[in-house]
């Protein structure tokens, strides 16, 4: 929706039509945080995971303390005693072990038990698996067993997407490879649906060529491949902003730039120092979720304009859940009743309700006030402005 809204406003500004703009467009590159938001809010697909038997707890054991504090701000990571374990994206009851074994040299030590495998796949599907991830020991040395499992998954559960670790992250590091593969399975269906709908909509409006999707490394990939490599486009929106900022900096003669990208769910900060973008070889996409794929370095927190403020009766919290764009903040007047960061900005006078989105959309301050007072102020014994200021702090 946001993409088409922007195209519509551009067409008005240029005194032309969206169709005319798209018909004259050779390359349409799109960056998105749809997959990032799904990961932060834990709103991805229900994933079933297949590990080598005996290693079913890889995601839980993680890599010791790194798996517990990785991805947290340094101040929290140093306070190890008071940190909470990261919220898993796959519940333990959706993990199964597969009898097989490949050695570190790639030699097959134990054959694959296909009968037990079929039973495990059927069990995961019966338990609601919408996507499957396969991560076997040393599969990047010899992918034969993973390839066979992929074939059997298609036989037993046709139509359910399968992510194989030797295809997603063929690198040493069992935990990171597993996390990367599981994340791909977790956000793959949503990302594919989003990109597919966007591509179809733009094509219907006159775009002749398939869209390209910005990747986490600052490059671009064809839309048709994104469903199979969804993890490669996490944070592609902010990364696209960094690429654009570098280009703009070149035009203006600046090579030291800090970028900030605030959306509905997250706030992303990037740094440009010179002509190159800093790369993180194994970034954390969220608390406890390192991936074995390089990416342009960003710092992301789960707080954006649509992040919902809530209370447990004792303390005020913000996020990670977001009201998104629809219904959005209460001030949008689209039926949203939860107080958000945007509502707090309206109440505190930081956002002008009459000039939101360059005056293209008017906000309703009364709805913001009602949401903050009823959900935050009254439960915590705070007046309206104290509650709004508390949300922003």
How should each PLM-predicted stretch be described?
Residues 1-393:
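N-terminally biased helix-coil "hinge/interface" segments that flank
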């Amino acid at each position: 929706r946001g993409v088409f809204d922007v195209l519509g406003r551009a067409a008005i500004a240029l005194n032309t039509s969206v169709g005319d703009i798209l018909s004259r467009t050779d390359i349409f590159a799109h960056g998105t945080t749809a997959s990032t938001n799904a990961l932060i809010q834990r709103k991805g697909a229900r994933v079933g995971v297949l590990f080598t038997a005996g290693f079913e707890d890889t995601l839980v054991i993680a890599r010791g303390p790194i798996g517990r504090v990785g991805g947290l701000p340094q101040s929290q990571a140093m306070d190890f005693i008071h940190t909470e374990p990261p919220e898993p994206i796959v519940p333990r009851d959706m993990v199964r072990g597969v009898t097989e074994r490949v050695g570190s040299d790639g030699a097959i030590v134990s054959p694959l038990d296909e009968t037990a495998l079929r039973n495990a796949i059927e069990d995961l599907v019966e338990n609601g698996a919408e996507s499957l991830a396969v991560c076997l020991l040393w599969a990047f040395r010899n992918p034969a067993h993973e390839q066979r499992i992929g074939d059997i998954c298609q036989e037993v559960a046709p139509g359910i997407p399968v992510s194989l670790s030797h295809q997603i992250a063929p690198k040493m590091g069992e935990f990171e490879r597993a996390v990367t593969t599981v994340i791909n399975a977790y956000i793959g269906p949503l990302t594919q649906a989003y990109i597919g709908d966007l591509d179809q909509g733009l094509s219907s409006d006159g775009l002749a060529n398939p869209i390209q999707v910005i990747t986490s490394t600052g490059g671009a990939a064809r839309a048709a491949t994104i469903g199979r490599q969804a993890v490669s486009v996490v944070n592609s929106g902010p990364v696209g902003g960094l690429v654009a900022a570098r280009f703009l900096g070149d035009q203006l003669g600046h090579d030291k730039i800090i970028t900030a990208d605030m959306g509905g769910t997250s706030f992303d900060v990037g740094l440009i120092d010179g002509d190159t973008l800093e790369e993180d070889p194994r970034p954390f996409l969220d608390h406890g979720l390192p991936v074995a794929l390089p990416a342009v370095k960003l710092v992301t927190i789960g707080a954006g304009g649509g992040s919902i403020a809530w209370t447990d009766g004792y303390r005020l919290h913000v996020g990670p859940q977001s009201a998104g764009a629809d219904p959005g903040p209460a001030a949008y007047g689209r039926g949203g009743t939860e107080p958000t960061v945007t509502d707090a900005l309206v109440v505190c006078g930081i956002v002008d309700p009459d000039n939101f989105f360059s005056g293209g959309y008017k906000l309703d301050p009364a709805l913001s006030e009602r949401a903050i007072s009823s959900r935050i102020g009254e439960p915590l014994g705070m007046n309206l402005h104290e509650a709004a200021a508390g949300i922003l702090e």
